[in-house]
From Swiss-Prot:
Residues with N4-methylasparagine modification: N72
The keyword Thylakoid is annotated on this UniProt entry: yes
Transmembrane parts of this sequence: none
Name of the protein described by the UniProt record: Allophycocyanin subunit beta-18
Assembly and oligomerization: Heterodimer of an alpha and a beta chain.
Membrane topology according to the record: Peripheral membrane protein
Top-level taxon of origin: Eukaryota
Family: Belongs to the phycobiliprotein family.
Keyword set, alphabetical order: Antenna complex, Bile pigment, Chloroplast, Chromophore, Electron transport, Membrane, Methylation, Photosynthesis, Phycobilisome, Plastid, Thylakoid, Transport
Amino acid sequence: MQDTITNILNKYDLTGKYLDNNALTQITTYLNTALQRLEVVEIIQSQSSKIIKEAAARMYSEQPELLRPGGNSYTTRKYAMCLRDIEYYLRYATYAIIAGNNDILNERVLDGLKDTYNSLNVPIAPTVRSIQIMEEIIHNEISKQDLKIIKKSIISEPFDHMIQNLSEQDI
Protein backbone atom coordinates (compact mmCIF):
# COMPACT_ATOMS: atom_id res chain seq x y z
CA MET A 1 0.00 0.00 0.00
CA GLN A 2 1.31 3.40 -0.93
CA ASP A 3 0.02 6.87 -0.29
CA THR A 4 -0.18 9.68 -2.80
CA ILE A 5 3.21 11.15 -1.90
CA THR A 6 5.02 7.81 -2.17
CA ASN A 7 3.42 7.14 -5.56
CA ILE A 8 4.47 10.55 -6.86
CA LEU A 9 8.02 10.20 -5.56
CA ASN A 10 8.38 6.69 -6.98
CA LYS A 11 7.17 7.86 -10.40
CA TYR A 12 9.68 10.68 -10.53
CA ASP A 13 12.48 8.55 -9.08
CA LEU A 14 11.97 5.90 -11.77
CA THR A 15 12.35 8.52 -14.49
CA GLY A 16 15.25 10.25 -12.73
CA LYS A 17 13.50 13.61 -12.73
CA TYR A 18 13.01 16.33 -10.17
CA LEU A 19 9.49 17.03 -9.01
CA ASP A 20 7.77 19.41 -11.40
CA ASN A 21 4.88 21.81 -10.79
CA ASN A 22 2.32 19.07 -11.43
CA ALA A 23 3.87 16.82 -8.77
CA LEU A 24 4.12 19.69 -6.29
CA THR A 25 0.47 20.59 -6.91
CA GLN A 26 -0.60 16.98 -6.27
CA ILE A 27 1.43 16.84 -3.05
CA THR A 28 0.05 20.21 -1.92
CA THR A 29 -3.51 19.02 -2.53
CA TYR A 30 -2.83 15.83 -0.58
CA LEU A 31 -1.40 17.76 2.37
CA ASN A 32 -4.13 20.42 2.28
CA THR A 33 -6.82 17.75 2.53
CA ALA A 34 -5.07 15.66 5.20
CA LEU A 35 -7.14 16.96 8.11
CA GLN A 36 -10.38 16.48 6.17
CA ARG A 37 -9.42 12.90 5.30
CA LEU A 38 -8.66 12.21 8.96
CA GLU A 39 -11.99 13.70 10.05
CA VAL A 40 -13.88 11.62 7.50
CA VAL A 41 -12.15 8.42 8.59
CA GLU A 42 -12.76 9.26 12.24
CA ILE A 43 -16.49 9.61 11.55
CA ILE A 44 -16.57 6.37 9.56
CA GLN A 45 -14.66 4.55 12.29
CA SER A 46 -16.94 5.81 15.04
CA GLN A 47 -20.08 5.01 13.01
CA SER A 48 -18.87 1.82 11.30
CA SER A 49 -21.34 -0.54 13.00
CA LYS A 50 -24.23 1.78 12.23
CA ILE A 51 -23.10 2.22 8.60
CA ILE A 52 -22.79 -1.54 8.06
CA LYS A 53 -26.10 -2.30 9.75
CA GLU A 54 -27.97 0.39 7.81
CA ALA A 55 -26.36 -0.59 4.49
CA ALA A 56 -27.37 -4.22 5.01
CA ALA A 57 -30.91 -3.30 6.08
CA ARG A 58 -31.42 -1.08 3.04
CA MET A 59 -29.92 -3.61 0.64
CA TYR A 60 -32.08 -6.45 2.00
CA SER A 61 -35.22 -4.29 1.93
CA GLU A 62 -34.48 -3.55 -1.75
CA GLN A 63 -33.55 -7.17 -2.53
CA PRO A 64 -35.46 -9.39 -0.07
CA GLU A 65 -34.96 -12.43 -2.29
CA LEU A 66 -31.40 -12.64 -0.95
CA LEU A 67 -32.81 -13.66 2.45
CA ARG A 68 -35.28 -16.22 1.12
CA PRO A 69 -34.49 -19.93 0.68
CA GLY A 70 -31.99 -20.23 -2.15
CA GLY A 71 -30.84 -16.63 -1.72
CA ASN A 72 -27.19 -15.83 -1.19
CA SER A 73 -27.83 -14.63 2.38
CA TYR A 74 -30.43 -17.22 3.34
CA THR A 75 -28.66 -18.94 6.23
CA THR A 76 -27.26 -17.22 9.29
CA ARG A 77 -23.78 -18.20 8.15
CA LYS A 78 -24.24 -16.66 4.70
CA TYR A 79 -25.82 -13.54 6.20
CA ALA A 80 -22.86 -13.14 8.55
CA MET A 81 -20.46 -13.57 5.63
CA CYS A 82 -22.25 -10.81 3.74
CA LEU A 83 -21.97 -8.45 6.71
CA ARG A 84 -18.30 -9.37 7.02
CA ASP A 85 -17.75 -8.48 3.37
CA ILE A 86 -19.57 -5.15 3.74
CA GLU A 87 -17.33 -4.35 6.73
CA TYR A 88 -14.30 -5.35 4.68
CA TYR A 89 -15.19 -2.92 1.85
CA LEU A 90 -15.80 -0.13 4.36
CA ARG A 91 -12.54 -0.72 6.21
CA TYR A 92 -10.44 -0.75 3.05
CA ALA A 93 -12.23 2.37 1.80
CA THR A 94 -10.99 4.15 4.94
CA TYR A 95 -7.44 3.03 4.19
CA ALA A 96 -7.75 4.46 0.68
CA ILE A 97 -9.16 7.72 2.05
CA ILE A 98 -6.21 8.15 4.42
CA ALA A 99 -3.69 7.21 1.72
CA GLY A 100 -5.34 9.47 -0.84
CA ASN A 101 -4.82 6.57 -3.21
CA ASN A 102 -6.98 3.66 -4.37
CA ASP A 103 -4.14 1.20 -5.04
CA ILE A 104 -4.84 -0.69 -1.82
CA LEU A 105 -8.34 -1.41 -3.08
CA ASN A 106 -6.89 -3.08 -6.16
CA GLU A 107 -4.28 -4.99 -4.17
CA ARG A 108 -6.41 -6.16 -1.25
CA VAL A 109 -10.03 -6.07 -2.40
CA LEU A 110 -10.57 -6.09 -6.15
CA ASP A 111 -7.79 -8.34 -7.49
CA GLY A 112 -9.06 -11.90 -7.38
CA LEU A 113 -12.55 -10.96 -6.27
CA LYS A 114 -14.06 -12.07 -9.57
CA ASP A 115 -12.65 -15.57 -9.21
CA THR A 116 -13.72 -15.83 -5.58
CA TYR A 117 -17.27 -14.66 -6.26
CA ASN A 118 -17.54 -16.91 -9.33
CA SER A 119 -16.41 -19.95 -7.37
CA LEU A 120 -18.97 -19.23 -4.63
CA ASN A 121 -21.80 -18.27 -7.03
CA VAL A 122 -22.10 -14.88 -5.34
CA PRO A 123 -23.93 -12.26 -7.44
CA ILE A 124 -22.06 -8.99 -7.81
CA ALA A 125 -25.06 -6.62 -8.02
CA PRO A 126 -25.90 -6.75 -4.28
CA THR A 127 -22.24 -6.12 -3.48
CA VAL A 128 -22.16 -3.07 -5.72
CA ARG A 129 -25.42 -1.84 -4.23
CA SER A 130 -24.16 -2.22 -0.66
CA ILE A 131 -21.09 -0.13 -1.54
CA GLN A 132 -23.31 2.55 -3.10
CA ILE A 133 -25.50 2.59 0.00
CA MET A 134 -22.49 2.93 2.31
CA GLU A 135 -21.26 5.90 0.31
CA GLU A 136 -24.71 7.54 0.61
CA ILE A 137 -24.82 6.90 4.36
CA ILE A 138 -21.35 8.38 4.86
CA HIS A 139 -22.22 11.52 2.89
CA ASN A 140 -25.32 11.89 5.10
CA GLU A 141 -23.30 11.37 8.29
CA ILE A 142 -20.73 13.96 7.18
CA SER A 143 -23.49 16.49 6.46
CA LYS A 144 -25.00 15.84 9.92
CA GLN A 145 -21.60 16.53 11.48
CA ASP A 146 -21.50 19.88 9.65
CA LEU A 147 -17.96 19.26 8.42
CA LYS A 148 -16.74 21.63 5.77
CA ILE A 149 -15.45 19.07 3.31
CA ILE A 150 -13.94 21.02 0.46
CA LYS A 151 -13.44 17.99 -1.77
CA LYS A 152 -16.44 15.63 -1.72
CA SER A 153 -14.31 13.30 -3.82
CA ILE A 154 -12.33 12.46 -0.67
CA ILE A 155 -15.31 10.32 0.32
CA SER A 156 -16.50 9.26 -3.13
CA GLU A 157 -13.26 8.18 -4.80
CA PRO A 158 -12.67 4.85 -3.05
CA PHE A 159 -16.34 3.82 -3.19
CA ASP A 160 -16.70 4.87 -6.83
CA HIS A 161 -13.47 3.03 -7.64
CA MET A 162 -14.80 -0.21 -6.15
CA ILE A 163 -18.19 0.23 -7.81
CA GLN A 164 -16.67 0.92 -11.21
CA ASN A 165 -14.25 -2.00 -11.02
CA LEU A 166 -16.83 -4.45 -9.75
CA SER A 167 -19.41 -3.31 -12.30
CA GLU A 168 -16.94 -3.83 -15.15
CA GLN A 169 -16.31 -7.42 -14.17
CA ASP A 170 -18.43 -10.04 -15.88
CA ILE A 171 -19.45 -12.16 -12.92
